[in-house]
């Protein structure tokens, strides 16, 4: 067996001491802070690209990969649900999934490019139409939020169950703090979003937050990358499940729920809900999907 490499104690002793000119520590990013001895090896960050074409292909591959992960999570339900990403070159265009293709079969080449200012299909897959309600919701969100590059929406079981309460999630555990003061509730159900007005109403309810609970409908999340938005959706779905279980447990009156305090929730939000961190969180799911099914979703 090969010997395990260990740091020499003399190395540690040779580090700058307090008061020396080089002793000031560089402030860690949230992602770096989550890794023990993070600066020993740089953690993978959101990549940059030399061309729009390279970034576009990367976005579409990760979008398709997110759908594959969602399929294993059990989020697929008929033609419901959609993910969109803003085109890196043309900021008035988004890419969205086609109508009726199962999440578990989605590929990068399936995606449709839509000008969200005009509603016209301008590229990508022209063999299958997009979901009209999806185009309405996502177009409105991208118009209203130029800072957002990806939007996710689905009718997953626990999200739509919890949405019937028409109230925000409570800070009941560490993970749900990703949404501390960063999610809202659309308190009106306006039916299938076939009109531009319903899409606009949803976008208005989203406001400046990361996510929105659509009453009697489902969940919607956003992100700087599709990875961030898709992972946030998974966190929100599980947070809805956790709260439903907790509400059922306390209904008998024998136990009480304990909320995380505002200070602690804000602290968790700062360190866990950073775009780089959430991007990194999704990568293990994508690697596992590739391990299970290969990389055909990138085609």
Regions found by a protein language model. Give the residues of each.
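A conserved C-terminal secondary-structure "cap"
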Residues: 4, 8-57, 63-66, 210-213, ...
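N-terminal low-complexity or amphipathic/hydrophobic leaders
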Residues: 26-119
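Flexible, glycine/proline-enriched loop segments at strand-loop-helix junctions
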Residues: 53-56, 123-132, 185-193
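Solvent-exposed alpha-helices and their adjacent loops that cap or buttress functional pockets
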Residues: 75-78, 86-89, 103-106, 142-145, ...
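Short beta-strand scaffold segments in enzyme catalytic cores
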Residues: 82-87, 94, 160, 212, ...
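Short beta-strand segments
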Residues: 86, 96-98, 152-154, 214-215
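Short HxH-centered metal-ligating active-site micro-motif
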Residues: 117-161, 196-208, 217
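Class I SAM-dependent methyltransferase SAM-binding "motif I" and its flanking Rossmann-like core
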Residues: 157-194, 198
């Amino acid at each position: 067996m090969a010997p395990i490499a260990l740091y020499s104690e003399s190395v540690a002793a040779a580090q700058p001491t307090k008061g020396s000119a080089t002793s000031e520590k560089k402030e860690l990013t949230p992602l770096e802070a989550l890794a023990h001895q993070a600066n020993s090896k740089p953690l993978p960050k959101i990549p940059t690209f030399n061309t729009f074409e390279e970034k576009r292909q990367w976005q579409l591959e990760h979008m398709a990969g997110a759908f594959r992960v969602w399929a294993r999570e059990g989020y697929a339900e008929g033609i419901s649900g959609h993910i969109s990403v803003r085109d890196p070159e043309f900021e008035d265009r988004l890419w969205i999934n086609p109508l009726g293709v199962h999440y578990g079969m989605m590929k990068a080449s399936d995606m449709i490019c839509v000008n969200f200012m005009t509603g016209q299909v301008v590229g990508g897959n022209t063999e299958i139409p997009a979901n009209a309600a999806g185009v309405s919701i996502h177009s409105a969100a991208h118009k209203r939020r130029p800072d957002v590059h990806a939007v996710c929406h689905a009718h997953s079981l626990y999200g739509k169950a919890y949405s019937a309460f028409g109230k925000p999630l409570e800070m009941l555990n560490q993970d749900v703090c990703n949404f501390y003061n960063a999610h809202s509730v659309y308190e009106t159900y306006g039916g299938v979003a076939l009109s531009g007005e319903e899409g606009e109403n949803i976008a208005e309810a989203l406001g400046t937050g990361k996510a929105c609970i659509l009453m009697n409908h489902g969940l919607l999340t956003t992100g700087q990358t599709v990875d961030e938005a898709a992972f946030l959706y998974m966190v929100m779905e599980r947070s809805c499940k956790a709260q439903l279980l907790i509400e059922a447990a306390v209904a008998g009156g024998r136990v009480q729920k304990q909320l995380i305090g505002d200070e602690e929730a804000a602290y968790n939000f700062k360190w866990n809900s950073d775009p780089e961190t959430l991007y990194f969180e999704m990568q293990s799911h994508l690697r596992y999907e590739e391990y299970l099914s290969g990389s055909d979703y990138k085609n």
